[in-house]
């Protein structure tokens, strides 16, 4: 039986401030650091082991992975970083407070922007400092690959080719894999693995810093999945993610 572990980064500074983060390279909070370490402790206690890791080019995911692997004495394993595992780009919403945006545009509209499959937020202009083309880490990307905004469908379309061409063959070769990434890049993979409909994906929330274990058969089809940690803590964390886009009472 194959085990694949998905880990959303620990709480970031902009998670704490309830801002749309996207491709902005913000760091972990102290709580996020502790979440990452705790994730490593849970995985070690579970007896998990890894041969190779995949993450994004954003420090909140990279640091989470490093902190978790350190708890497992696995910092020596190869780590592949790719922009294809980045969070979805939130376009002109990037940096805005989610509750204030809900007050301005309505909770329903913000929920559509945050969670719908194929409705992107308002796009950036290329002259905007938030446009990824101004960031040297993306200098090798084509203009077509640099997003002005993204919906989940766009994130799926940039992630899945990497899954099929790189990660899945690595797993099939017998390597034990962990993917440390972001809420929406991981939602993209979960949607594919569990064959979740475009409509039902709206209700899927992935909490920060909690390892999600997939048990797969030899055809890479899920047998079951489960979070490591206290079930009540997992439920509370998922509810917290769901409530981020609501207007302040």
UniProtKB/Swiss-Prot annotation:
Substrate binds at residues 8-15, 21-22, 60, 87-90, 98, 114-115, 183-184. It holds the Pfam family His_Phos_1. The active site is at 9 (tele-phosphohistidine intermediate), 87 (proton donor/acceptor). Keywords: Gluconeogenesis, Glycolysis, Isomerase. The lineage of its organism: Bacteria, Pseudomonadati, Chlorobiota, Chlorobiia, Chlorobiales. It comes from the Bacteria. This is 2,3-bisphosphoglycerate-dependent phosphoglycerate mutase. The gene is gpmA. InterPro entries: His_Pase_superF_clade-1 (IPR013078), His_PPase_superfam (IPR029033), PG/BPGM_mutase_AS (IPR001345), Phosphogly_mut1 (IPR005952). GO terms for biological process: gluconeogenesis; glycolytic process. The record marks 182 as: Transition state stabilizer.
């Amino acid at each position: 039986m194959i085990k694949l572990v998905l880990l959303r980064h620990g709480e970031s500074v902009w998670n704490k401030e309830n801002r749309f983060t996207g491709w902005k390279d913000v760091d972990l909070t102290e709580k996020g650091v502790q979440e990452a370490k705790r994730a490593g402790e849970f995985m070690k206690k579970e007896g998990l082991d890894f041969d190779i890791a995949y993450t994004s080019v954003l420090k909140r995911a990279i640091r989470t992975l490093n902190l978790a692997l350190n708890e497992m004495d696995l910092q020596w394993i190869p780590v592949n970083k790719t922009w294809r595992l980045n969070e979805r780009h939130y376009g002109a919403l990037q940096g805005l407070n989610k509750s204030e945006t809900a007050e301005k545009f309505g909770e329903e509209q913000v929920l559509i922007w945050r969670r719908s499959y194929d409705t992107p937020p308002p796009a950036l202009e290329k002259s905007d400092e938030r446009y990824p083309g101004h960031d040297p880490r993306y200098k090798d990307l084509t203009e077509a690959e640099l997003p002005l905004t993204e919906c989940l469908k766009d994130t799926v379309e940039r992630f899945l080719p990497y899954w099929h061409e790189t990660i899945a063959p690595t797993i099939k070769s017998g390597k034990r894999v962990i993917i440390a990434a972001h809420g929406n890049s991981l939602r993209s993979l979960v949607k594919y693995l569990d064959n979740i409909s475009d409509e039902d994906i709206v209700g899927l929330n992935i909490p920060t810093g909690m390892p999600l274990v997939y048990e797969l058969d030899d055809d890479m089809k899920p047998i079951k999945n489960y979070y490591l940690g206290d079930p009540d803590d997992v439920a509370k964390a998922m509810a917290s993610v769901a409530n981020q886009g609501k207007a302040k009472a």
